[in-house]
Design a protein with these regions (language model features):
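A general structural signal for well-ordered alpha-helical segments in protein cores
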Residues: 3, 24, 53-54, 67, ...
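A generic helix-loop boundary/linker signal
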Residues: 17-18, 47, 84, 113
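Conserved AdoMet
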Residues: 29-104
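Conserved SAM/SAH cofactor-binding pocket of Class I
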Residues: 93-124
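Non-catalytic accessory regions of SAM-dependent methyltransferases
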Residues: 1-37, 41-45
Length: 124
């Protein structure tokens, strides 16, 4: 199976084409161990690893489980955080909020900031 075929699995399930492309690249990076550069340079992908990627894409298409839950982590402010169905996935908007909070803390010389019960702990 080729990468466009795996993308089609996701788009056929209703996932937007751009999102499907990004998600397949994430699956390839995580489950096959290839970087985005490897993919863009046309490096031949191992068939067995590609089969795992295909299985994970089918799981995503069937369950519509968030891609972060399938790969087991979410990126937040340049760091990776473990997530699963028991943890809220940090959103891009939260990064904006955290950047503003950091700015507020620095500008007002606050010594303590408190983050309680906000999910994955990425804000803390």
């Amino acid at each position: 199976m080729l990468i466009p075929d795996i993308v089609k699995i996701l788009t056929d399930s209703g996932i937007e084409p751009n999102e499907a492309n990004v998600e397949v690249k994430l699956l390839i990076e995580h489950f096959a161990g290839y970087s985005l550069v490897d993919i863009l340079m046309g490096k031949k992908l191992d068939e067995e690893k590609l089969k795992i990627v295909e299985e994970k894409a089918k799981l995503r298409a069937k369950t519509h489980q968030p891609i972060q839950h399938i790969i087991g982590f979410a990126d937040f402010m340049g760091e990776k955080f473990v997530v699963n169905s028991d943890v809220l996935i940090p959103r891009d908007e939260t990064e904006i909020l955290v950047r503003k909070a950091i700015e507020l803390i620095k500008n007002n010389n606050y010594k303590i900031a408190l983050d309680m019960c906000t999910g994955s702990g990425c804000i803390a």
